[in-house]
Amino acid sequence: MTDANGAPAEAAPQIRMQVLAQYVRDMSFENMVAQKGLQGGDVQPDIQVQVSLDARKRSVEHQYEVITKFKVTSKNKSGAAETLFLMELDYGGIFHVENVPEEQMHPFLLIECPRLLFPFVRRIISDVTRDGGFPPLNIDTVDFLALYRMELARRAEAQKAAQPVQ
């Protein structure tokens, strides 16, 4: 390609991303059924999954830490809507990211990085629920782009509400 003067146009540098580490930062699983001595007879689980994300720059150049936080609650739809189990998982990754424009870094970290971590999160949740005495829970795929957009809209509303009316 050439620019308007006929000189070769410089190609944008290719984005480079490398996963340096993945880890469970924090995890808990509470089996309320076993704790309360409930029978597993008439159980109709209602699963709710809450997801939040966090990212921060590390002291090493081009390195970022991304944390995905999942809170999974299962309640019994029939009867008194008792909680069957509660699982909380903070799963992190350390990423080396280069050649992403500064204005695109925030969405890149909160959309693309969690997308890479998600299969591992799903597997951990499935294994832990199975090991906790329940059928394995394979949570639905998370649309991290939609989640990012919802968070931006929420922040814009909060900022708008915080401004004094004149």
Curated annotation (Swiss-Prot):
One of its GO terms (molecular function) is unfolded protein binding. Transmembrane segments: none annotated. GO terms for cellular component: cytoplasm. Its main location: cytoplasm. Keywords: Chaperone, Cytoplasm, Protein transport, Translocation, Transport. GO terms for biological process: protein folding; protein tetramerization; protein transport. Pfam families: SecB. It is found in: Cytoplasm. Belongs to the SecB family. Homotetramer, a dimer of dimers. One homotetramer interacts with 1 SecA dimer. One of the proteins required for the normal export of preproteins out of the cell cytoplasm. It is a molecular chaperone that binds to a subset of precursor proteins, maintaining them in a translocation-competent state. It also specifically binds to its receptor SecA. This is Protein-export protein SecB. It comes from Cereibacter sphaeroides (strain ATCC 17025 / ATH 2.4.3) (Rhodobacter sphaeroides). The gene is secB.
